[in-house]
């Protein structure tokens, strides 16, 4: 006996079959990472087109799998370097997306920004006392990475499925700037004073979070 489905049910099935699907069961691996000696990662990325295609969804799945594993304390389990954020071009997708998941001052911050734009930056500067690291930079570069004390950034947040605006300071603010730099083809060591890597100004805000030394 043939069962006739309602038109609404058939339409739902068609949508499921047609729309690209995101795989949220990926296991992170360091083989995903693109290092800083690759030409493309040193170049500006391109805007993401909507609706997202399968390549964009695959990138989102990888970014979330990698950083969430780090956040959950499973980096050693998967043999990866822990990170609090990752940009799309760090896993070989040359588009404007990044994902952050971290704790800062006892508050959990989590966002996956697509086509982010900086709309304001503080005049005063800031830096992490521990310095910065990067998943795509195997060689450590000693020195203070000078950034802005606060940042206001806007973009489409995939997690909330809407345009959002974030104003952030502290570790979260530093991480937003770090990941945005990646989308411009820049690395943290480009912001270290080449003549005096440990140079500081007494007016600059010092951030001293509890972070693994190799975390991005």
Curated annotation (Swiss-Prot):
Tell me the keywords, alphabetical order: Hydrolase, Iron, Metal-binding, Protein biosynthesis
Q: How is the cofactor bound?
A: Binds 1 Fe(2+) ion.
User: Record-annotated residues binding Fe cation?
Assistant: 134, 178, 182
**EC identifiers of the protein:** 3.5.1.88
Q: Which residues carry out catalysis? A: 179
Can you state which reaction this protein catalyses? N-terminal N-formyl-L-methionyl-[peptide] + H2O = N-terminal L-methionyl-[peptide] + formate
Database matches in InterPro entries: Peptide_deformylase, Peptide_deformylase_sf
Q: Which cofactor does it need?
A: Fe(2+)
* GO MF: metal ion binding; peptide deformylase activity
The record, for SUPFAM superfamilies, names: Peptide deformylase
Q: Which processes are annotated in GO (biological process)? A: co-translational protein modification; translation
Broad class of enzyme this protein falls into: hydrolase
Lineage: superkingdom: Bacteria
The UniProt record lists the keyword Hydrolase: yes
Instruction: Return the similarity comment.
Output: Belongs to the polypeptide deformylase family.
Q: What does this protein do?
A: Removes the formyl group from the N-terminal Met of newly synthesized proteins. Requires at least a dipeptide for an efficient rate of reaction. N-terminal L-methionine is a prerequisite for activity but the enzyme has broad specificity at other positions.
Name the UniProt record assigns to this protein = Peptide deformylase
């Amino acid at each position: 006996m043939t069962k006739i489905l309602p038109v609404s049910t058939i339409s739902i099935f068609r949508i499921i079959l047609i729309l690209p699907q995101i795989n949220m069961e990926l296991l992170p691996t360091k083989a995903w990472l693109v290092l800083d000696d690759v030409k493309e990662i040193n170049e500006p990325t391109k805007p993401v087109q909507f609706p997202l295609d399968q390549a964009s969804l695959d990138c989102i799945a990888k970014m979330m799998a990698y950083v969430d594993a780090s956040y959950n304390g499973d980096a050693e389990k998967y043999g990866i370097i822990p990170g609090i954020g990752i940009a799309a071009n760090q896993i070989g997708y040359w588009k404007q997306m990044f994902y952050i998941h971290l704790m800062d001052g006892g508050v959990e911050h989590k966002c996956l920004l697509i086509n982010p734009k900086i709309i304001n930056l503080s005049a005063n500067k800031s830096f992490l006392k521990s310095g910065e690291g990067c998943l795509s930079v195997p060689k450590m570069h000693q020195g203070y990475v000078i950034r802005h004390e606060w940042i206001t950034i806007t973009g489409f947040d995939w997690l909330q499925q809407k345009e959002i605006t974030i104003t952030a300071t502290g570790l979260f603010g530093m991480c937003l700037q770090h990941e945005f730099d990646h989308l411009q083809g820049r690395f943290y060591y480009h912001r270290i004073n080449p003549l005096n890597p440990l140079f500081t100004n007494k007016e600059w805000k010092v951030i001293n979070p509890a972070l693994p030394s190799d975390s991005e």
